[in-house]
Amino acid sequence: MYKKKRCFTLLKYLDVKSNYHIVLNLKKILSGIIQVKAQLDILMSYQCEYLKCLDQELKFYISGTRLAHYYNFIAFLIDGVNKQNDTMCKLYKQYNEYIYLWKKKQKKIKMWNNINSRLLLNRFKLSQLDDQDLLDSCCTYKYLLKNDREDTDYV
């Protein structure tokens, strides 16, 4: 019984430890998501501002080489935004995987807690039965001693 409890406690400890690492990875992923969102917002605002400036300069006529530089810069901005969106998608997928693993580990930990509580209750019942047996044997012994003394008094 004790070995089972110890084994289940060890398994629970291992699950709690791995769950802790999953939570740490989730925190890292969330900080990465926040960082990428901030970068994406900066890129988008910069792109909008740059497009406004380009629109104003187009109204006043820009030379062809200068316009090509603007288009190249806008293309780089769009490429950067797309890369940031791709990393966001990857981070969200990782986040969902780790959330799934975390939920799975939580269920396991609940199961180990349940098994440990059952074993503890079973152990408590066994100790109560042992105490009751000891008490019964003690009462029986006293009764037998009492009867034995009564028998010797008459002889």
Curated annotation (Swiss-Prot):
Key word Cell membrane present: yes
Topological type in the membrane: Peripheral membrane protein
GO cellular component: plasma membrane
Biological processes, Gene Ontology terms: bacterial-type flagellum organization; chemotaxis; protein transport
Location (main, coarse): membrane
InterPro entries found in the cross-reference section: Flag_assembly_chemotaxis_eff (IPR053716)
Cell compartments where the protein resides: Cell membrane
Coiled coil: none
Stated role: Flagellar protein that affects chemotactic events.
Similarity field: Belongs to the FliJ family.
Protein name: Flagellar FliJ protein
